[in-house]
UniProtKB/Swiss-Prot annotation:
GO biological process: cell wall organization; FtsZ-dependent cytokinesis; peptidoglycan biosynthetic process; regulation of cell shape
Protein name in the entry: Probable peptidoglycan glycosyltransferase FtsW
Native organism: Pseudomonas fluorescens (strain SBW25)
Keyword line: Cell cycle, Cell division, Cell inner membrane, Cell membrane, Cell shape, Cell wall biogenesis/degradation, Glycosyltransferase, Membrane, Peptidoglycan synthesis, Transferase, Transmembrane, Transmembrane helix
Function according to Swiss-Prot or TrEMBL: Peptidoglycan polymerase that is essential for cell division.
Chief localization: membrane
PROSITE patterns in UniProt: FTSW_RODA_SPOVE
HAMAP family: PGT_FtsW_proteobact (MF_00913)
Transmembrane segments: 26-46, 66-86, 90-110, 120-140, 156-176, 182-202, 204-224, 284-304, 322-342, 356-376
Coiled-coil ranges from the UniProt annotation: none
Superkingdom per UniProt: Bacteria
UniProt topological domain (Cytoplasmic) ranges: 1-25, 87-89, 141-155, 203, 305-321, 377-407
Amino acid sequence: MSIDFRNIIKPYPSPIITGRGIDLDFPMLAGCLALLGLGLVMITSASSEVAAVQSGNTLYMMIRHLVYLVIGLGACIVTMMIPIATWQRLGWLMLIGAFGLLIMVILPGIGREVNGSMRWIGFGAFNVQPSEIAKVFVVIYLAGYLVRRQKEVRESWMGFFKPFIVLLPMAGLLLMEPDFGATVVMMGAAAAMLFLGGVGLFRFTLMVVLAVAAVTVLVQAQPYRMARLITFTDPWSDQFGSGYQLTQALIAFGRGEWLGVGLGNSVQKQFYLPEAHTDFVFSVLAEELGVVGSLCTVALFVFVCVRGMYIGMWAEKAKQYFAAYVAYGLSFLWIGQFLINIGVNVGLLPTKGLTLPFLSYGGSSLVICCACLGLLLRIEWESRTHLGSEEMEFSESDFAEEPTHGR
């Protein structure tokens, strides 16, 4: 008796196994895999000196990153197997889970302090960063809200303000860690989703003005944030003090010139540039691969983010509005984090502790990025094969024989 293993591992139709084989958005997948591969190479180079001192093995950080990468690819596959309708039904539970994680991380004895911030929950040798999970859960919840309350959001102030009953307490928990960067990224993505959801221009403008005012107050409320802002305007005035990290990052860009000094030949990673393998991995990349390599990396990021937005548009055309909002929201998270990290590295923004998606060393960020990729691939597949995300009963006949639009 033969056993069809596809029926064991595939409770629902999925882009992994279909009647035509693997049916994925290969341009999106290729772009993200290219970034992941580049990230692995740069982590191997940028972390070698730190790893040698901390563990005696120059490949220690690379091995850990590779483990996170394998876990992340597994998370990507799992999210591709789950129907988008399931995420929509679980929106409230995810929101509660996000609040629970953010509360846990600030509790003494549970949260783990690193560099003066309580942003991690320790599980043995590994740390989990709840803010990375919370940002995605907020996107999923808000996408469901925009679908349920579409008319209310577009026509009334109450529909506009209701999401902030959830968003503001969550932002407060993030600021208690403190994690100002994650707060800005999350609130920025939420604001963009509300705008796409049909919030009037006047209400959106008011929201932006209030957000700018809030950021101004938050910067002035904490001396270290104010110091970073002052240093950012002229880092060379205190290049061995508060401006040290930024000046070393700029030196890395200067050393790289057009074609770079070559892979593995960075000088700045040798304890001159702090966090060379995490927040400032792009500076090491610029030093080793030069302006040309940096621009190619930026082009890859632009392609991936634009492709994510197009996936949202395709879902919207297929009238799968929840999936469309999720795709938009995830893309905005990537765009926000990418712009802030690159801006910090090149000196256009004050120093902020945000990783570069797909490239920086960090298990939580890498796994969540891969899971988001899985969601986007699932959304693209469902919109292309016209699998409904509301009341669909799955069967083998749901597999489309031909794509309904070319991409």
